[in-house]
């Protein structure tokens, strides 16, 4: 399982995960990334999202219709910047991940988890077993294809 200590985070990763920051839209690593695999918490290495739930939302950040497990994410009321939103944090490391909105695809439940790339690490499908995430392979529709 991949893990990082807080002192290993770069400036942007620290700003996002520890200071509730937001990275620029359309200028982040995973906003337009659709390779098969999982997205894990940058600090704890806990799996949070899969490419199966990722969709193109044109918001400039990676968007997912649901979390891999409700046990791994925490939703909190966020009243910053004069708005009321729902913040998403990692349960294990208490890192800020992004926000969840009710404007996602209706056919998948209507949610859009808008996640900062700086808060997650992508693990390609073909590396799941090697990196200790083999138990997640059944979450993929086409388990043999990359």
Swiss-Prot record:
Q: What is the lineage of its organism?
A: Bacteria, Bacillati, Bacillota, Bacilli, Bacillales
Domain MsrB intervals: 2-125
Kindly state which keywords UniProt assigns to this record, in alphabetical order: Oxidoreductase
> Is the keyword Oxidoreductase in the record?
yes
Which species is listed as the source?
Staphylococcus carnosus (strain TM300)
Q: Which GO terms describe its biological process?
A: protein repair; response to oxidative stress
HAMAP family from the UniProt entry: MsrB
This chain's protein is named: Peptide methionine sulfoxide reductase MsrB
Q: Which Pfam families match?
A: SelR (PF01641)
**Which spans of this chain does the record mark as coiled coil?**
none
- Gene Ontology molecular function: peptide-methionine (R)-S-oxide reductase activity
Catalytically driven reaction(s): L-methionyl-[protein] + [thioredoxin]-disulfide + H2O = L-methionyl-(R)-S-oxide-[protein] + [thioredoxin]-dithiol
Q: Does the keyword Oxidoreductase apply?
A: yes
- Can you quote a single GO CC term? cytoplasm
**PROSITE patterns, per this entry?**
MSRB
Q: Which residues form the active site?
A: 114
Matching PANTHER family, A to Z? Answer: METHIONINE SULFOXIDE REDUCTASE, PEPTIDE METHIONINE SULFOXIDE REDUCTASE MSRA_MSRB
> What pairs make up the disulfide bonds?
none
Provide the family line: Belongs to the MsrB Met sulfoxide reductase family.
- What EC designation does it have? 1.8.4.12
């Amino acid at each position: 399982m991949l893990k990082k200590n807080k002192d290993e985070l770069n400036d942007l990763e620290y700003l996002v995960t520890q200071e509730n920051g937001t990275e620029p839209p359309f200028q982040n690593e995973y906003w337009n990334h659709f390779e098969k695999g999982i997205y894990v918490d940058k600090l704890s290495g806990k799996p949070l999202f899969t490419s199966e739930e990722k969709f193109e939302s044109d918001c400039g950040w990676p968007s997912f219709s649901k979390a891999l497990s409700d046990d791994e994410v925490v939703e909190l009321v966020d009243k910053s910047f004069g708005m009321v939103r729902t913040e998403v944090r990692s349960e294990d490391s208490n890192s800020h991940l992004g926000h969840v909105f009710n404007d996602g695809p209706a056919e998948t439940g209507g949610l859009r988890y808008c996640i900062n790339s700086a808060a997650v690490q992508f693990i390609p499908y073909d590396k799941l077993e090697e990196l200790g995430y083999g138990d997640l392979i059944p979450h993929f529709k086409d388990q043999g294809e990359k």
